[in-house]
Amino acid sequence: MTLKERCVFKLLTCLTTQHDLRLVLVASAVCLAGCFTTFRLYSRMRGARGVVRAAWLLLTGLVAGSSVWATHFIAMVAFTPGLKTGYSPTGTLLSLMIAALFMASGFAVASAQRSTTNDFAGGVLIGLGVAAMHYMGMSAFVTQGQLVWEHATVGMSAVLGVGGATAALLLAGTARTIRRQAVGGGMLCLGIVMLHFTGMSAITIVPDASLTVPDQLLSGGMLTLAVGSITSMIILGGLGAVAIESQTSRSALERIRRLANAAYEGLVVVQSGRINDANAAFCDLVGAPLAELVGRPLFGEILTFDEADPSREDVRREGRLRPLVGGREIPVEVFSRLMDDGARVETSGLTVLAVRDLRERRAAEEKIRYLAEHDGLTGLLNRNSLQMRLAAAIDRVEASGESLAVICIDLDHFKEANDQHGHLAGDALLVETARRLQSAVQAPSFAARLGGDEFIVVQIAGGDQPAVAAELAGRLIEMLAAPVPFDGQELAMGSSLGVSLYPDDGRTAEALMANADMALYRAKESGRGVYRFFKREMDDTIRERRNLARDLRQGIADNELIVHYQPLARAADGEVCGFEALVRWKHPTRGMIPPLDFIPVAEENGLIEALGDWVLRRACADAAAWEKPLRIAVNLSPIQLHNPALPTLVHEVLITTGLSPSRLELEITESALFKDYQRALDNLRRLKALGVRIAMDDFGTGFSSLSTLQSFPFDKIKIDKSFVENIHRHDRATAIVRAVLGLGRSLEIPVVAEGVETEEQILFLRGEDCAELQGYAIGRPAPVDALTMWTTAGDPGAIAPKSKTRRSA
């Protein structure tokens, strides 16, 4: 009979003839429960770090050791040799300590690194521990006989124990699942049971009457009670710890999942390139429930990158996410990181990826880019984009041989619409202009807005110039001439155009735009509603006016302007009763510049309102300082008259300067009224309510004068000097002056004669009951310092009529 056969025979004989099979089953059940609990604890120990790991390891070793120990001694109680037996307390307890120590050491080695070598080494330690515990326990066994050991069978038992423990660790692996825990526990239990009963079959008891069993030894019943109690408490404690930890982990996991699902970003956990878990946001992005995603490959199928290693840690990159249920690819930003909570290693090999949907960001970036390149109101290219596009267009035509024209456009009636109807009306004109320009040009030509009411069209065409540009310019003039409906009325439109051609008028974007602007300036001088091509002779003239406009703007800011005052005298006695404020400009290098030179420049360049406001403030401040309460007359430009803020400005100036409202006289022309008749009358009524006097200037040169006098109670009428200077020279002029003076008497409106230059004119006007006189015959315009003879209290203020025939300013 071979050794194997002999061992099997002795094992079966030992079990069937020397053991109580019921207790054998109990021992096996205790062993199985203990081993299963051991692997439950082992899985927790592998998933922990630091002090927590050490605590789980200690508990694992204690439960495993007590399970082996309990199995051994319950099986020993089942052993019935037919002799009196007992157990040494010291040896019994020492065997428990040996079992716990070896078990803890074996599991520590197995979990130190995830490898077959570690599992094998740990299994050997555990198997040897089971053998050491068994034979230490056998040393605590006392009976009335001599124990004879069969060493080959003893060796076989140790091999079975080591083999069972090693197989258990190899099969269980990390023991993450219940199934693996059950397999590992069952295999370890089998190894323990096989070692025990094989070892028991290795002994033969030779009865010896001389040997006695001391009464102080543990009996079988006492041992069963002690072992059962201790082992039950340890195993139940281990199971309780596992249950508590599992519940805690589930609660924490649920909290984490809720937080993850509340996150705006998609979160996905990947292991070996496959989806392990994901939050609700990621599922929504992919368009599939979590159950369909788990186990699917993430990279390549759902998420693609340009990088070769998409799961590299702590790298932020952009990629494309492909929804599972159709739809367009979604641009995403992905940040990946290895999972590590600082205490657990269950996440070993797992990578968490935060996936952010970039569609809104891309849309916002595109909008920002669009706004940076386009005008916010009209949607046309803005000035910066125009420069780049025009430079690119020049490169294109240089290579292709096409022709290029730059057309500068200015709206003729924009300012009037803006002033009369408000900014909404102005915006409506700009938007409609942009729409018409876009409909008039086709790619590769394009339109842009420079700012205000200035637009640019860049024409790229294949025809001959200037014919092609002239055709487009004429078409634009016609298109922009049609009125624009707004708020139940039609706003007047119209435009002036300046055209420059490449390369004749410039080879750079800056030169072409500057020359087109000069041509536009000439078009506006020609009466508007026309287009003009750039010509070299325009350059010097227009540049001079541009320089003058620039200097005037700076001059207003630097207080280079001064106000001269021309006296007005009562016709009856010649006493000065007031002054008219007349602006003068003393240029730092050019000297005095006549008003006829810089006033038109101010009107053309939008400076007239600022100029008028400055004169109003300066004149009121000067007049407030005079000792005599003489009146001060200030001219209002049409733009000022139609500005809704004019009454507020006048009120503020009067308060600031301290000038009495009755001393301020505002002069307007008839032509200024009719640009927006109703708004002008509203402003005049508000000014009258302040106590300010209103005079109609240049009476007789406009139209509908009588209806104007009927509509508003003017305080004064000023006869234009073109009639006064022809008194006694032309009968019609004399008759007109006499008629106006008669009209003033009938309406009880004082009349002032402008441009009085001779004594003969003074005598005629005095004879016709003219109220006041103004002109060189009365006094020249002079700075405020030269007025003291009239403005100082106590001075009679009368002037002697002059016969010099000079033109008044």
Swiss-Prot record:
Q: What is its main location?
A: membrane
CDD domains in the record: EAL, GGDEF, PAS
**Mind telling me which residue stretches traverse the membrane in this protein?**
23-43, 57-77, 92-112, 122-142, 152-172, 186-206, 224-244
Gene3D superfamilies, A to Z: 3.30.70.270, EAL domain (3.20.20.450), PAS domain (3.30.450.20)
- Domain of life from the UniProt record: Bacteria
Q: Give the bilayer topology.
A: Multi-pass membrane protein
List residues of the EAL domain. 545-795
Q: What does the UniProt entry say about where the protein is found?
A: Cell membrane
Gene Ontology CC: plasma membrane
The PAS domain is annotated at 254-317
Q: Which residues form the GGDEF domain?
A: 402-536
Q: Name one Pfam family in it.
A: GGDEF
Q: Please report the stretch or stretches of sequence annotated as the MHYT domain.
A: 19-206
Keyword set for this entry? Cell membrane, Membrane, Transmembrane, Transmembrane helix
PANTHER family in the record, alphabetically?
Answer: BIOFILM ARCHITECTURE MAINTENANCE PROTEIN MBAA, DIGUANYLATE CYCLASE DGCP
Query: Can you name this protein?
Result: Uncharacterized signaling protein CC_0091
